[in-house]
């Protein structure tokens, strides 16, 4: 990894008035020029991290670094970051141009440069021609663009975004996701985005930190987070999941629902109790006799791009299926899935334990592969004599 632009070392936060612990020993590094998302439900601590970076809150313990410099005692206005708030925090008595130009005027930039830079950023956020428009006459999406333009006008090292899309309607929110991501990539500025919306995080991020109860429970790329959740919380918080109790018989073989299935996971103890995760979109409806499992359809909803089907197996386990094929309530169907569709989670495994287990397992696999290759080469040499 390159030199981090932001680093948290053992950062904790306790609100002393009610002794509430909101952050617990947070450690992470953010690389320059990437789009990071802090994802979690209300009260998870994600906005607290953002406010500590901005200097709006002090950490109780730990160190915060910006570009290698400890900034715990540096005031907000001296930090090379800018925050876009959920409320946008625009000045209603100023027009669009004046709002965007405000940070430059605070720094006493000359009028010609202000004109050039404001014109440039308004073009970036697709607000050309809105310079003299009153803030009160703008739509929610337009106000959002003004707030972003003001955030980037000083070319900060980091832009912090605290749930800026939450007040927008679905269509506009989706459009702004594309615009934010494209803008970040064009500028090359580090974006730190806070949201409770899983789809936003998956769509825009280079890297996601999933938070719960003041802790980072998992971090990774959107694909890693979605395909390889490390625990029950992440599996249920990120998308829909079918989660069942199971037993890892041995590497690549798991038992659940009273049957054994091939899998792609390994590195666990023989007969270890685990949780089995299969995503609804990975289940394919078949004839009952052709399925690996048989279930009875209970309810069905049309979601536009697919049907969401709820079914139950003979053991009473609930199954959610996303299918373009319409089912009939009350009918018995088969469910087919591939070994790679089965994800295995150890009970109560932390991210550190997960990473260590995978690293150790890969090393053992490589050693075994090397030994097999050596034996085969030795046999080939003997056969050639």
Curated annotation (Swiss-Prot):
It catalyses: ATP + H2O + polyamine-[polyamine-binding protein]Side 1 = ADP + phosphate + polyamineSide 2 + [polyamine-binding protein]Side 1. It is found in: Cell membrane. ATP binds at residues 40-47. Pfam families: ABC_tran, TOBE_2. GO terms for molecular function: ABC-type polyamine transporter activity; ATP binding; ATP hydrolysis activity. Its main location: membrane. Disulfide bonds: none annotated. GO terms for cellular component: ATP-binding cassette (ABC) transporter complex. Its EC number is 7.6.2.11. Keywords: ATP-binding, Cell membrane, Membrane, Nucleotide-binding, Translocase, Transport. Residues 6-238 form the ABC transporter domain. It is a peripheral membrane protein. InterPro entries: AAA+_ATPase, ABC_SmlMolc_Importer, ABC_transporter-like_ATP-bd, ABC_transporter-like_CS, Mo/tungstate-bd_C_term_dom, P-loop_NTPase, Transp-assoc_OB_typ2. Belongs to the ABC transporter superfamily. Spermidine/putrescine importer (TC 3.A.1.11.1) family. The complex is composed of two ATP-binding proteins (PotA), two transmembrane proteins (PotB and PotC) and a solute-binding protein (PotD). Part of the ABC transporter complex PotABCD involved in spermidine/putrescine import. Responsible for energy coupling to the transport system. PANTHER family: SPERMIDINE/PUTRESCINE IMPORT ATP-BINDING PROTEIN POTA (PTHR42781), SPERMIDINE_PUTRESCINE IMPORT ATP-BINDING PROTEIN POTA (PTHR42781:SF4). This is Spermidine/putrescine import ATP-binding protein PotA. It comes from Streptococcus sanguinis (strain SK36).
């Amino acid at each position: 990894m390159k030199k981090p632009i932001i680093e948290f070392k053992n950062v904790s936060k306790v609100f002393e008035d009610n002794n509430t612990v909101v952050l617990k020993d947070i450690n992470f590094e953010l690389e320059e020029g990437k789009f990071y998302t802090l994802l979690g439900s209300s009260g998870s601590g994600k906005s607290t991290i953002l406010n500590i970076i901005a200097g709006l809150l002090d950490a109780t313990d730990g160190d915060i670094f910006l570009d290698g410099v400890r900034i715990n005692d540096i005031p907000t206005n001296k930090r090379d970051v800018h925050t876009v708030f959920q409320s946008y925090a625009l000045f209603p008595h100023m027009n669009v141009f004046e709002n965007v130009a405000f940070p430059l005027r605070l720094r006493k930039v000359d009028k010609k440069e202000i004109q050039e830079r404001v014109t440039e950023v308004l073009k970036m956020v697709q607000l050309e021609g809105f310079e003299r428009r009153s803030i009160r006459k703008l739509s929610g999406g337009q106000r959002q663009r003004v707030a972003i333009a003001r955030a980037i006008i000083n070319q900060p090292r980091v832009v912090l975004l605290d749930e800026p899309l939450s007040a927008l309607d679905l269509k506009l929110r989706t459009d702004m996701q594309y615009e934010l991501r494209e803008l970040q990539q064009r500028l090359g500025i580090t974006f730190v985005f806070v949201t409770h919306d899983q789809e936003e995080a998956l769509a825009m991020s280079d890297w996601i930190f999933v938070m719960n109860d003041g802790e980072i429970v998992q971090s990774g790329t959107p694909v890693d987070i979605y395909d390889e959740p490390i625990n029950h919380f992440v599996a249920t918080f990120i998308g829909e999941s079918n989660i069942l109790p199971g037993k890892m018989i041995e590497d690549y073989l798991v038992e659940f629902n009273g049957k054994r299935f091939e899998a792609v996971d390994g590195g666990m103890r023989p007969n270890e109790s685990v949780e089995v995760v299969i995503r609804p979109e990975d289940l394919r409806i078949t004839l009952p006799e052709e399925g690996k499992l048989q279930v009875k359809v209970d309810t069905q909803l049309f979601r536009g791009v697919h049907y969401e089907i709820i079914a139950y197996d003979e053991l009473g386990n609930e199954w959610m299926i996303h299918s373009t094929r319409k089912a009939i309530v009350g009918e018995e169907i088969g469910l087919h899935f591939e070994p790679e569709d089965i994800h295995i989670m150890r009970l109560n495994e932390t991210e550190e334990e997960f990473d260590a287990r995978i690293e150790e397992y890969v090393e053992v696999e490589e050693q075994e592969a090397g030994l097999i290759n050596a034996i085969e080469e030795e046999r080939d040499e003997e056969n050639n004599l």
